């Protein structure tokens, strides 16, 4: 039979029947930490994982019942645990005007589970789900709008900053966490007063006590930056990490995932990759390419950090990104210290978006092969992704 999937705190009861005389019956194996109650008199079997994860418990095992040293019943069971190394999350943003975001989960047996957060917590995460991060036995979620959409519609969301137990998905923290930036277009931008609401967009957790959140401002994303969140109090700082705040897609933090690797955080900023030291919360290195935009970063299977830059371009990219390219797009590889180890031009057919409406190209990397995946077209509505081999330079067009 196929393995039986069970949720933490659930139970399955079975009525047992025998097709003939069985002289002796005994249970010879059961998952460690689970309840496995075999009642011969009542001819019943009850299987239940614990309500919470406990150290040393089996996530999956086999219940075996035998007679005269011969198995007469054997069934595999597993608990739906969201930390399994072979599980995969798919984050669905939702729509800012009509519905909240959600997540789906493919478990280690490639079974598809919908609305795992909603079923466990009896509510939705929030409006415009942006990012999630697993660390310290927890899952951290970021939503852009929280309980209220940018159109003012109230949804049944838990907030803009939500923390769950990584094993069970049970909600631990739910905060709407509004924060603001002061935008003065005549003199530049500071972060001293409550003037413009900020939209949290990406998170990286650097320790059990601290995380960084990248955000952009709610005035059509004119500015962006990175701030510190205290994970003990779940309060976000009122000022930015120096060197991360500026004009969106030009001098401010890129609306893209940050990478935490070997004690450092790698992030995009305008035309640069910046390296932050969580010990000092300071930018300790900047790698800049003039007249380009950094679009995304990802950590390759070889341990290097890969950044993808647009080609060199002229003109104001504006919201839709009508740029004229003079040099091709480029992949830059950096080592653990942020030193450039290679610069590789991409084929000239690859023209990456430059407008503020398309700040990233959704790049990710394979954990096991030298492949990067990203959108290589300027079309705002493009839905194809290509695969790039950073060892051979080979491109598989429209791979996804």
Located regions from the model:
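Structural motif
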Residues: 97-104, 149-162, 220-228, 271-277, ...
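Loop/turn-rich, solvent-exposed surfaces of beta-rich toroidal or solenoidal domains
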Residues: 354-400
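A short beta-strand motif characteristic of beta-propeller blades
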Residues: 111-124, 170-193, 234-248, 282-288, ...
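Repeated scaffold domains used in trafficking and secretory/extracellular systems
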Residues: 124-133, 181-204, 243-262, 291-302, ...
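C-terminal edge beta-strand
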Residues: 72-82
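Short loop/turn segments that connect beta-strands within beta-propeller blades
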Residues: 107-110, 165-169, 230-234, 277-281, ...
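Post-signal peptide N-terminal segment of secreted/secretory-pathway proteins
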Residues: 40, 46-55, 94-199
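Short, solvent-exposed loop/linker segments at beta-strand-coil boundaries, enriched for Pro/Gly
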Residues: 22-37
